[in-house]
Curated annotation (Swiss-Prot):
InterPro entries: AsnC-type_HTH_dom, Dimeric_a/b-barrel, Tscrpt_reg_AsnC-like, Tscrpt_reg_AsnC/Lrp_C, Tscrpt_reg_HTH_AsnC-type_CS, WH-like_DNA-bd_sf, WH_DNA-bd_sf. Keywords: DNA-binding, Transcription, Transcription regulation. GO terms for biological process: response to amino acid. GO terms for molecular function: sequence-specific DNA binding. It comes from Haemophilus influenzae (strain ATCC 51907 / DSM 11121 / KW20 / Rd). Residues 19-80 form the HTH asnC-type domain. The keyword Ligase does not apply. Residues 38-57 bind DNA. The keyword Membrane does not apply. One of its GO terms (cellular component) is cytosol. Transmembrane segments: none annotated. Gene3D superfamilies: 3.30.70.920, Winged helix-like DNA-binding domain superfamily/Winged helix DNA-binding domain (1.10.10.10). It holds the Pfam family AsnC_trans_reg. This is Uncharacterized HTH-type transcriptional regulator HI_0224.
Amino acid sequence: MIIFFSIVTFLRNYLMQTLDKLDRHILNVLQQDAMIPLKELSEKVNSSVATCQRRVQSLTDSGIITKRVAVVSPKAVGRTISVFVMVEMDNQHSYYQEQFERKMRQEDEVVSCYEISGDYDFMLLLHAKDMESYHAFTRRVLTGEFHVRTYKSLFVMNFTKADSGIIL
């Protein structure tokens, strides 16, 4: 197992070292607008369309670009409550953690699920339609059935910055 993680770490470090200025420029532009036409992208990064197409494909094939998404305003689609949920498991066995992670992937309200260190085991970000739907989520998911000992809800009062980009 240690050898596998060492290889993965080496490959990630190697990929980051092999990102040249053009790759970083392409990634910065795509993080602002993943739907930008190749012609426009090539103009912004001062390269040919063919080169940009090859670079984007290479960045995708290597796992640096994992997916292209549209960022949707939760309020605009009726999700008026945003909540960070700190979850403590009653059993840290990997089987139960994986079961919990599978359940989180199935839940539409859950936007992010992070395994974390410290007093809690997981941190969730979810967008709920209203308090009633959030309460239903907690009754359905944050239960002993999924080995949740306790959870803490932190309701978002205001989004000052919600950006998923990594400036390179």
